[in-house]
Amino acid sequence: MPYKISRAAYAGMFGPTVGDKVRLADTELFIEIEKDHTTYGEEVKFGGGKVIRDGMGQSQATRAEGAVDTVITNAVIVDHSGIYKADVGLKNGRIHAIGKAGNPDTQPGVTIIVGPSTEAIAGEGKILTAGGMDAHIHYICPQQIEEALMSGVTCMLGGGSGPAHGTLATTCTGAWHIERMIESFDAFPMNLALAGKGNASLPAPLEEMILAGASSLKLHEDWGTTPAAIDNCLTVADEYDVQVMIHTDTLNESGFVEDTVAAIRGRTIHAFHTEGAGGGHAPDIIKVCGNPNVIPSSTNPTRPYTVNTLAEHLDMLMVCHHLSPSIPEDIAFAESRIRKETIAAEDILHDIGAFSIISSDSQAMGRVGEVAIRTWQTADKMKRQRGRLKEETGENDNFRVRRYIAKYTINPAIAQGVSHEIGSVEVGKRADLVLWNPAFFGVKPEMVLLGGSIAAAPMGDPNASIPTPQPMHYRPMFAAYGKLRTNSSVTFVSQASLDGGLAQRLGVAKKLLAVKNVRGGISKASMIHNSLTPHIEVDPETYEVRADGELLTCEPATVLPMAQRYFLF
């Protein structure tokens, strides 16, 4: 007779299985396990008296014979592709297999071989996600990188050279600074990439930045986002296969949103803070989220719309864009960008999948450690205010969760040409993974892996007899040190710079990898679960936003999950 175990006891031993539901942090979001790749009665688990022991769940296989380097056991995987339970095998810094781990000599159906060289990470009762990607970074200070890593971000793309005033406001890196920044990247356990300045009316200056290692080009209004600059930048980007990100002209000095759309001429472009509070044609830049060639994204200060959103934005904007509260024109500029109507509409546009990406805008009207938190707060607010999505098929929030996790994992990776390496829990991709306790999901990771090695984790007193005594706080782990630091992460650059000998010229230790397929091969339709293109109208007097004729409005939140309950200090 097979042994029977209660569902509760099974979940306590091996984690939830098909049909079980898990609450995400203190939100109203509930996921349900759709599929379990493990085998009942043959589960592997590490520990005293458990399964992964010699001759039992551990085989005699060497690495050469197929044993993986690390196995993550019985994890609940939350990914754009689905919500399911599986063992995950890591090998040579990549995801080697997703399925059933164990010893093929004694167990049936094994797809991940556990051998004597295999390390074990206990995923029972835990959630595993891809590392996050933040595609809107101002490299104002290097300390941002550790802050982002500890929040579950494993790739940062942006521009700048430190607290220079150009970097405080924009993410546009000049050619010499690009090379110097790439040299500095050896010091950081993080996948990194740089954007060059896209504001030029002739090709040569942009080409020099791409050849210096820019993975993308950024058009920013503070440098003059004119129709001529837009057209030239996209023309060069098409030639070199790099993405263009745009922050449009808030003051409408060189044209209106229609002029910008005309200058883009149907070419693929990533529109930053498309709602407009972070910058862009006032009051109607949000209209471009209905264009099939525009990939719209948000920065996290407006995520989600709360009773405090408007008040904090005015001060943020004055500081970030070098404005003076004593100059009336500067105050008028700032006030033109902050509109409660478009911010409220942004919540709903995210929920219906019309906005595709969420990023931070780090220290330049954004919080680098809150990309995940703000994403899930938005999802929670929308469930409370709008109810279940029509796409849901069960008594769960699986589709909504898949839509929202795509906004900071796979979609920015696709938009910026790195989805062949990162962005999802997928065989063959880099093992840049984050393990979460469900009660702390999206807030405080339990473990962050880079290239298959542990880079960060909460850790107690190093002098204690066990790892858990206070003070417990996030600390860098071994993937943040020595040669492993440069072997466990990469720098993304343009293919043209690699062809031009950038790696040899700079002599950096980190591997340089090329971005690819960011021009005609992708569009809004490439944004997984977030590809809707409604017709957007903005009333120029009231700022009311309509999508396909329907008014988009919602109340500001007065209370949010994932907030003070998790941060006592």
Swiss-Prot record:
Enzyme Commission number(s): 3.5.1.5
A single Gene Ontology CC term = cytoplasm
Which Pfam families does this chain map to?
Amidohydro_1 (PF01979), Urease_alpha (PF00449)
Q: Identify the pathway.
A: Nitrogen metabolism; urea degradation; CO(2) and NH(3) from urea (urease route): step 1/1
Instruction: Describe how it is modified after translation.
Output: Carboxylation allows a single lysine to coordinate two nickel ions.
Recorded GO MF terms: nickel cation binding; urease activity
Q: Where along the chain is Ni(2+) 1 bound?
A: 136, 138, 218, 361
**Domain Urease residue range list:** 131-569
Q: Which residues carry this modification: N6-carboxylysine?
A: 218
Q: Keyword set for this entry?
A: Cytoplasm, Hydrolase, Metal-binding, Nickel
Cofactor(s) listed: Ni cation
- GO biological process: one example: urea catabolic process
User: Could you say which residues bind Ni(2+) 2 here?
Assistant: 218, 247, 273
Provide the catalytic activity annotation: urea + 2 H2O + H(+) = hydrogencarbonate + 2 NH4(+)
Subunit info?
A: Heterotrimer of UreA (gamma), UreB (beta) and UreC (alpha) subunits. Three heterotrimers associate to form the active enzyme.
What does the Swiss-Prot or TrEMBL cofactor note state? Binds 2 nickel ions per subunit.
Q: Where in the cell is it found?
A: Cytoplasm
- What is this protein identified as? Urease subunit alpha
* Superkingdom of the source species: Bacteria
Active site feature: 321 (proton donor)
